[in-house]
Amino acid sequence: MYSEGSTLATLAVCLIPLFVALKSSSKIAQSWSAFRWLTLAYSALSLLTVVGTQARTGLVALAAYIGLLLKKHKINFKVFLAICMIPLLIYAIAPKSWFHRMSSIEDATTSEKSAIGRIVVWRWTLDYVSERPLFGGGFYSYNANAGILHHYQQGDEVEIKQQGGKAFHNIFFEVLGETGYGGLFLFLSILLHTILLNRRTIKRLGGEVGVIGGALSHSLIIYCVGGLFIGVAFYPWIYYLYGVSLALSTVEES
């Protein structure tokens, strides 16, 4: 399920805040010192996954995580050092092909078929849903765009020639196209409720439980940022995070 490069890289970055939280706020970490090194090793492997897949979505997700770190922590020496270590580590291990792939992000929106294809599908989705606004077209409804996407191109964009249907490649357009505005409302409600649950947990309990709650929110935000370019709305990760956040919200203050 998560074997596609962009999806795998995004999920790998989603795991990093959870590993970091478990490193400092886990009962196992308190009783087994090697566990902390294990979480650091898994975090490093997650970075290697971003490099190894050469997926630009992974870099976007990683940038989102760095942004969350900057927002959450005061810029002291430890935080500054940790953030600086990420690009240095990538620079040390990444092949030239990775840098070439990442350098194409800037002009991808006008010259690369993969990126243009996504944008064209999103335009088509808005048109498609205008005829079935409440419930959308159902699962795999993207197949309805087979052979007609060229009608939604604009200006000097690279030409899209595709006989079969092209997937949504965006969790929000995916939900909109397949379940309509009704489904999108429910989906956004789940995301918002997850964030609010964890904010309440952080405010009410703080401490180790609060750290876990913050990590759950960060993982969800990273997943959504990566999900702007991949169709993973119905993969289980979002719903795992929602379920754990609900469970965490029931913890009583000791």
Task: Name each model-derived stretch.
Residues 33-43, 56-63, 78-83, 101, ...:
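Alpha-helical transmembrane segments of integral membrane proteins
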Residues 24-28, 57, 76, 102-106, ...:
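Membrane-interfacial segments
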Residues 108-123, 131, 135-179, 200-204, ...:
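Long extracytoplasmic/lumenal interhelical loops at the membrane interface
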Residues 253-254:
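Short, charged juxtamembrane terminal tails flanking transmembrane helices
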Residues 6, 231-241:
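Loop-to-transmembrane alpha-helix initiation sites
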